[in-house]
Amino acid sequence: MKSVITTTISAADAAGRFPSSSDLESIQGNIQRAAARLEAAQKLSGNHEAVVKEAGDACFAKYSYLKNAGEAGDSPEKINKCYRDIDHYMRLINYSLVVGGTGPVDEWGIAGSREVYRALNLPGSAYIAAFTFTRDRLCVPRDMSSQAGVEFTSALDYVINSLC
């Protein structure tokens, strides 16, 4: 799983060198942000059901046609799968916050998702709308500290940009 630490160490090892001062500064910055990432992960874990429901509701509010016959959400089963997918991505975001890198999202979420969505006639824009709603809904300090909010929105932005 990729993180700033494992990526930095791997690059130094591949070059047959010790990590440079700038490598170590990057790792130190990552470690200093760890408390904020863990706070964001804890807040998401503690409230994930509401976050997923609100994100899914926002998706279907923006793209109400998805519930029409022949569309991606034309049955309760398909609608539940959309919420399940949003929950899956939120878990991956949580894991990424914990490890301090995008590895979980890259390895278990993004790889191949665009192709799967196209094959199943699922518009990626609907998922983007769900994650954008979650990002824009965040209220500091109501939901989490400002630094935790920065970490959470960065993780959401990574997913949003990866799905574009």
From Swiss-Prot:
GO terms for biological process: photosynthesis. It comes from Griffithsia monilis. The keyword Thylakoid applies. This is R-phycoerythrin alpha chain. (2R,3E)-phycoerythrobilin 1 binds at residues 81-82, 84, 88. CDD domains: PE_alpha (cd14769). Contains two covalently linked phycoerythrobilin chromophores. The gene is cpeA. It is a peripheral membrane protein. It is found in: Plastid, Chloroplast thylakoid membrane. It holds the Pfam family Phycobilisome. Its main location: plastid. Heterododecamer of 6 alpha and 6 beta chains. The basic functional unit of phycobiliproteins is a ring-shaped hexamer formed from two back-to-back trimers contacting via the alpha chain subunits. The trimers are composed of alpha/beta subunit heterodimers arranged around a three-fold axis of symmetry. The phycoerythrins also contain a gamma subunit which is located in the center of the hexamer. Keywords: Antenna complex, Bile pigment, Chloroplast, Chromophore, Electron transport, Membrane, Photosynthesis, Phycobilisome, Plastid, Thylakoid, Transport. Light-harvesting photosynthetic tetrapyrrole chromophore-protein from the phycobiliprotein complex. Gene3D superfamilies: Phycocyanins (1.10.490.20). GO terms for cellular component: chloroplast thylakoid membrane; phycobilisome.
